[in-house]
Swiss-Prot record:
The protein's name: tRNA modification GTPase MnmE
Keywords assigned by UniProt, alphabetized: Cytoplasm, GTP-binding, Hydrolase, Magnesium, Metal-binding, Nucleotide-binding, Potassium, tRNA processing
Pfam families: MMR_HSR1, MnmE_helical, TrmE_N
Leading EC class: hydrolase
Annotated positions binding Mg(2+): S240, T261
GO biological process: tRNA methylation; tRNA wobble uridine modification
Subcellular location per the Swiss-Prot or TrEMBL entry: Cytoplasm
Xref: HAMAP family: GTPase_MnmE (MF_00379)
EC id: 3.6.-.-
Length: 464
């Protein structure tokens, strides 16, 4: 049978493995109370008071107990999904959870109860107006947050901080659209009417607010995605030592033997709440060793995908001919920072040198062995990422949000151009406003394709 958004669904809502508590969640969809009450009777042997915790046995089809725990019944619309929902909180062993799940499926076979798909409970919450799309995505972002700052920002998005900003923009665009489109109906008055209502001034304020929202969203995207930083360079220049220094732990083997690192070593660290995904790679050189050559090929693949490349050099030799060959292969669109390591052997103080001319690279002089200059390097990485100190109060945002905000920004810029031409382009002015509104509505899901919804919710865990 084809799954639909109105089917009754069930899933284990807690993570796999053993724990003190495990939760099985049922959302009854079109079955409503007519399905919920018989299932509650079958599993719990008694009626449950709505929104009250009841300590009951969970029984099989013969009345024998499978477990004892807390049962919670939430009649619609006062539930997570907006439908009638039952939650069974039992002991968190995988066998117990599977027994409860199968018992629900068996008892609910008569009204079409099926296993939930990934993210289907949250999808129901979105479809039933319990959450908008940005808030629904924040549920997954909160679960997946890799830093405290990311978790707090996801919580703000879930609370509606991002959505409120978008809704305010949409309301302002709608108000301006109404003004412009009403003016189109009275062409003999269009110039005086628009000027009297200060249409261009209103548009300028909308664009200013959108730029502010986009700036905050960029900061939120950094909190969510972080920065991929690849350590690259010749063998034995201290890449593994730098990874260990940045991470504050001995993660990579460090020896004076060239070619010790043959495959990547990755570690995520936090700097001001931003996850930095540091990747130590095989030293770049010509070699006949087949295993090392595979590692070097993987290094170049990582460099192609990097957000930032740290090109490590030995400060005793500086930029050699071999280093020039390596630098020439770096992809043009990836920022590169030249890191001169081993200043403990040269006596050069740790420092950051920003480029004096276009085309030059930032240079960081440091000692990974002693830790000199490591904080300077962290600060430089945050600067490249565009992180603003104190921005941890922003909401979390995704790449699709940034794309929509930039598209709306472009449409509003086009609208401003048409507004300057007055009557000759008034219909185009109105159309650009409509397109900007459409992009903003896509963020909260008021205008969203079914295909996009499928992609978003398929990335959730089952049971959420």
């Amino acid at each position: 049978m084809l799954a639909t958004d109105s089917d009754p669904i069930v899933a284990i809502a807690t993570a796999a493995g053993r724990g003190g508590i495990g939760v099985v969640r049922v959302s009854f969809g079109r079955g409503g109370e007519a399905a919920a009450l018989p299932l509650i009777d079958a599993l719990c042997g008694q009626r449950l008071a709505p929104r009250h915790a009841s300590y009951v046995p969970f029984v099989d089809e013969h009345g024998a107990p499978l477990d004892r725990g807390i049962a919670l019944y939430f009649p619609a619309p006062h539930s997570y999904t907006g439908e009638h929902v039952l939650e069974l909180q039992g002991h968190g062993g995988p066998i117990v959870m599977q027994l409860l799940l199968q018992r629900c499926l068996d008892a609910g076979r008569g009204f079409g109860l099926r296993l939930a798909q990934p993210g289907e409970f949250t999808r129901r919450a979105f479809l039933n107006d319990k959450l908008d799309l940005a808030q629904a995505e924040a549920v997954a972002d909160l679960i997946e947050a890799s830093t405290e700052a990311a978790a707090r920002s996801a919580g703000r998005s879930l609370d509606g901080a991002f959505s409120r900003q978008i809704h305010a923009l949409v309301e302002d665009v709608i108000t301006l659209r109404m003004l412009v489109e009403a003016t189109l109906d009275f062409p003999e008055e269009e110039i005086d009417f628009l000027e009297a209502a200060d249409a261009r001034g209103k548009l300028a304020k909308i664009r200013e607010q959108l730029a502010h929202v986009l700036g905050d969203a960029r900061q939120g995207a950094l909190l969510r995605e972080g920065l991929s930083v690849v350590l690259a360079g010749q063998p034995n220049v201290g890449k593994s030592s730098l990874l260990n220094a940045l991470a504050g732990a001995e993660l990579a083997i460090v020896t004076p033997i060239a070619g010790t690192t043959r495959d990547k070593v990755a570690q995520t660290i936090q700097v001001e709440g931003i996850p930095l995904h540091i990747i130590d790679t095989a030293g770049l050189r010509e070699t006949e060793d087949e295993v090392e050559r595979i590692g070097i090929a993987r290094t170049w693949s990582e460099i192609e995908r990097a957000d930032v490349v740290l090109h490590l050099l030995d400060s005793r030799t500086g930029m050699t001919a071999d280093d020039e060959v390596i630098a020439a292969r770096f992809p043009g669109g990836v920022p590169v920072v030249r890191v001169l390591n081993k200043t403990d052997l040269t006596g050069v103080p740790a420092c950051v040198e920003h480029p004096a001319a276009a085309g030059d690279l930032t240079e960081v002089h440091l000692s990974a062995k002693r830790g000199d200059g490591i904080d300077m390097l962290r600060a430089e990485l945050l600067r490249i990422a565009g992180w603003q100190a104190g921005a941890e109060g922003v909401y979390l945002a995704r790449e699709r949000h940034l794309i929509a905000l930039r598209a709306a920004q472009e449409h509003l810029a086009q609208a401003a151009d048409h507004a300057e031409q007055r009557a000759q382009s008034l219909d185009l002015f109105a159309e650009e406003l409509r397109l900007a509104q459409e992009q903003l509505n896509a963020i909260t899901g008021e205008f969203t394709s079914d295909d996009l919804l499928g992609v978003i919710f398929s990335r959730f865990c089952i049971g959420k």
